[in-house]
């Protein structure tokens, strides 16, 4: 019995000692955590903001499927989701913006993307998903190897955007731009602009010009556009120059001098944004005029440099044509024989 009491006494003492130890540690930690570190603020002028781009998307699926895709673990995401009126899967009577990811955090909406020399735009952008469901099909006879977003092998019917959606989008975008000064007009872009080989959203029905009128995003001045168009009708810039102009504005395109697949995709994305009434993927005087009108407005020095090249190439081509004509005429024979009709 004596031994049992001794054992109990020792155990009680150990328990009390442990409780005191825990209490002392807790108090010590509280004192340390509450103490003010010797930190003084000395603001530097040398810093930047994380957010530099605002990217517009359409979901291509209804509201409920969009929520599942953007919210459930393991999927994609965006910072905001704007539902659509008359969507049977939307449970509320009035539209409201859903905030899915805090703006200070990275959302998974841009994927493999490039704009104005920056890559992986998830790191530096805010993404807005808008519920809008186009109907797209691929040509079954074209083969599995052809999987481009633009071209004859793909058919898409794009519906108009809900006006109530656009009202919410304009209000949200203005609020975002007011808080993120690094998002310049040319940095308000669509998913197709930053990933033209694999995306076509927000599509040619997206009201870019309406947003521009509200102070959101870029657009050309009509008079400037018309002047470039008239000039390029007389002498169209070569494909290499247009490729460089598109790259200067922000698109991920290399100058190859030929109308290759990358050029077709980039030109299609550009036309959906700035010439939505003619999405052909072809380089013509209107497309070139729109690109140069945008550069003239937002990157004037670069536009001037490209026009210097344009004039030099025009003069060079004119000289080459004159030399070729002279080469044909300088001999005694200036006709091609045999002639179809002999005199």
Functional labels for PLM-detected ranges:
Residues 232-304:
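Short acidic, glycine/serine/threonine-rich helix-capping segments at coil-helix boundaries
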Residues 5-22:
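Bacterial N-terminal signal peptides that target proteins for export
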Residues 32-33:
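C-terminal motif of bacterial Sec signal peptides marking the signal peptidase cleavage site
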Residues 68, 176-191, 254-258, 279-282:
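Surface-exposed patches in mature extracellular/periplasmic domains of secreted proteins
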Residues 36-182, 186:
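Active-site-adjacent loop/helix surface patches within enzyme catalytic domains
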Residues 276-342:
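Extracellular LysM carbohydrate-binding repeats and other cell-envelope/extracellular binding modules
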């Amino acid at each position: 019995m004596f031994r049992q009491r001794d054992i109990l006494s020792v155990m009680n003492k150990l328990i009390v000692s442990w409780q005191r130890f825990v209490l002392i540690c807790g108090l010590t930690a509280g004192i340390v955590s509450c103490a003010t570190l010797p930190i003084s603020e000395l603001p530097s002028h040398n810093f930047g903001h994380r957010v530099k781009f605002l990217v517009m998307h359409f979901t291509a699926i209804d509201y409920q499927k969009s929520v599942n895709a953007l919210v459930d673990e393991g999927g994609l995401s965006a910072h905001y989701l704007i539902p659509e009126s008359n969507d049977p899967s939307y449970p509320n009577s009035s539209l409201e913006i859903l905030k899915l990811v805090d703006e200070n955090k990275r959302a998974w909406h841009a994927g493999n993307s490039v704009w104005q020399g920056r890559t992986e735009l998830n790191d530096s952008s805010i993404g807005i998903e808008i519920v809008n469901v186009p109907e797209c099909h691929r040509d079954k006879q074209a083969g599995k190897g052809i999987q481009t977003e633009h071209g004859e092998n793909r058919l898409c019917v794009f519906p108009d955007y809900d006006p109530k959606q656009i009202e919410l989008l304009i209000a949200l975008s203005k609020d975002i731009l007011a808080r993120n000064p690094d998002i310049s007009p040319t940095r308000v872009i669509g998913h197709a602009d930053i990933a033209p080989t694999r995306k076509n959203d927000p599509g040619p029905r997206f009201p870019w010009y309406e947003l521009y009128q509200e102070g959101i995003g870029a657009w050309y001045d009509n008079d400037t556009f018309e002047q470039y168009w008239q000039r390029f009708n007389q002498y169209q810039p070569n494909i290499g120059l247009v490729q460089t102009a598109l790259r200067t504005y922000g698109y991920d395109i290399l100058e190859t001098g030929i109308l290759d697949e990358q050029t077709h995709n980039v030109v299609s994305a550009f036309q959906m944004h700035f010439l939505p009434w003619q999405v052909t993927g072809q380089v013509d005087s209107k497309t070139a005029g729109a690109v140069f009108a945008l550069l003239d407005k937002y990157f004037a020095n670069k536009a001037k440099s490209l026009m210097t090249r344009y004039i030099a190439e025009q003069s060079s081509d004119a000289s080459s044509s004159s030399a070729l004509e002279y080469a044909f005429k300088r001999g005694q024979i200036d006709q091609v024989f045999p002639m179809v009709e002999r005199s």
